[in-house]
Amino acid sequence: MKGEIKMRKNFGVKTWLYPMPVFIVAAYDEEGKANAMNAAWGGIYTDNMVGICLAEEHQTTHNILASKAFTVSMATAGQVVACDYVGLVSGKKVPDKVEKAGFHTVKSAFVNAPVIEELPMTLECELVSYDPETCHMVGRIVNVSADETVLGEDDKIDLDKLRPITYDPIHHHYRVLGEKVGNAFSDGKSLK
């Protein structure tokens, strides 16, 4: 029968969406010590803002609310162990977890937040809002910085060099984002 959907299984309400970015969110505490956490529920909110779901009980959330600034770095294939680690342990229980992960930080030149040197792409953000009921945090992107090692010939970020990872919420795996399959805002013109 035309229009009939075959071979489709229903799973109910799940947080299954691809790709799910792996963000490493970092902020300073009141003493100026860097803390970071792994966050997968987030993305671009508007043309100059990022939105992330962060529970109020996280140390990183507390630090962001106090400092009004944070960074968001893309987790990469080369740093998967360290990126997973900062999501496994709490900064409340392991105050030196950034160091234990093997990360080194420098202060952003644009906001009062740490840039993790081992993660080559970072969004440097000012806090815009946080809703404790929904755990939704919005940050204004003040700057995007990238290590020169991940830049292509066009002097822009090259995904093949960056090798960002995505989280598979179904199987609890990390995967590297894949190959180029087309040209945005271009390939669809063939159907006009």
Mark where each language-model region is.
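Basic, polyanion-binding surface patches
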Residues: 2-192
